[in-house]
Amino acid sequence: FIKKYLYVAVFIYVPYLFMAQFNPLIRDHKESAVLFMFFMLSTICGSLANNTLLAMGDRDYLMVRVVLVSPYMNFLGRLAVKMVTDFVYFTIILNLFGVSFVHSLLLSLVTMCIRPAGEMIAVLCFDQMQSMYNNRNAFNGTVIALSVFVAYGMPLLKRQISSDWLFFIHPVFVVAALFIGVFSVYYLWDYPSYRKIMQEALHIKREV
């Protein structure tokens, strides 16, 4: 919880305070600014560039090689924990930073649903698009750069937070995100080659 709280404080709330000093329209729309930056940096960027599929820590190594948990169950367990903690923690944290409870709940729900979509894209890249997978660092760097530019650059360039930018808390988008999340979880549940992915993760871990 503390790590997520500090993340929102440093990368979202502090930039908002900086922008608010020079832009009255941003200052007067604090909730919109926090929502927009969170969506770009956490929901989009975090899901695409910071997926857990190939990030194998010591705990995962012990679970698979020592405790003999299957790579399939290990990955799905990690994903389930991440989705639930994101939903619960971010709902609380966004509310603490001045976002209404309803909007905090909706954005956290959207974020939870987009997480498995990011993992599904990583699986598709690993399985079907080797050129993109082999250049994943460049892909991740591009996603991060674009997300940062949109999150910080758009409000500074426009000197306001447009209500049109908050489409992601509209009920229609939330329902669409739910369908995307369900489809992604089904795809990940049915995917047969987690052992192959785990071998690649072990190779990356040895290189590091």
What is each of the regions a protein language model found here?
Residues 1-61, 70-208:
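Hydrophobic alpha-helical transmembrane segments of membrane proteins
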Residues 66:
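Catalytic-core elements of nucleic-acid end-processing and repair enzymes
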